[in-house]
From Swiss-Prot:
Transmembrane segments: none annotated. It comes from Rhodospirillum rubrum (strain ATCC 11170 / ATH 1.1.1 / DSM 467 / LMG 4362 / NCIMB 8255 / S1). It is an enzyme of class 2 (transferase). Its main location: cytoplasm. Gene3D superfamilies: Leucyl/phenylalanyl-tRNA-protein transferase, C-terminal domain. Functions in the N-end rule pathway of protein degradation where it conjugates Leu, Phe and, less efficiently, Met from aminoacyl-tRNAs to the N-termini of proteins containing an N-terminal arginine or lysine. PANTHER family: LEUCYL/PHENYLALANYL-TRNA--PROTEIN TRANSFERASE, LEUCYL_PHENYLALANYL-TRNA--PROTEIN TRANSFERASE. Its EC number is 2.3.2.6. The gene is aat. Belongs to the L/F-transferase family. Keywords: Acyltransferase, Cytoplasm, Transferase. The keyword Cytoplasm applies. GO terms for biological process: protein catabolic process. This is Leucyl/phenylalanyl-tRNA--protein transferase. InterPro entries: Acyl_CoA_acyltransferase, Leu/Phe-tRNA_Trfase, Leu/Phe-tRNA_Trfase_C.
Amino acid sequence: MISITPEILVRAYASGVFPMARAHDDPQLYWIDPDERGVLPLDGLHVSRSLRKVLRHCPFTVTIDTVFVEVLKQCAAPVPGRDETWINAEIEHLFTDLFDLGLGHSVECWQGDQLVGGLYGLAMGGVFFGESMFSRVDNASKVALCHLVARLKRGGFRLLDTQFTTNHLRSMGAVEIARPLYHARLGNALQVMGDFTVDVPDVLAALDTPSGY
């Protein structure tokens, strides 16, 4: 069995494939390149009136890249209604290495000193590959996603890859596109250098500013 390194993982994502495990305790990784790929158009994020109110009077402190490993562990943890996860120890180790290389990123939502929601993924060129999100209180993952999209728009990104779609992601604007179209968009977006560290002083203003993507 070939050992997967961070370098191999980066090349795989750039080629349009990503790894998953069948279960947290399954050490084997499987390469996935679905016929229909989930993406969230950056100008297509659905922000309801009630969510706008939450963002305007945000009950969370939102941070970037401060507790990446903890976000990863929370995403991998079982929750009511989902006893199993595709994030195994190998994925945790690989993405921790990617974070150390400056490629892995997280968005974190806090209430006081409690981490109550967040997401993590991989930034390459003008693409953000969203891996997983979690929420322990109402709206936490939605707020994290809004902050992510605002940052991607401000930073000049062109593609937010969600891998698959879920009811939650579809309600926020995610759609499925055919594999050939995804690969074409991926190739174009990788030619752009997005800036994940860009300052985002006003999330709603960033979300309301068209990016063309």
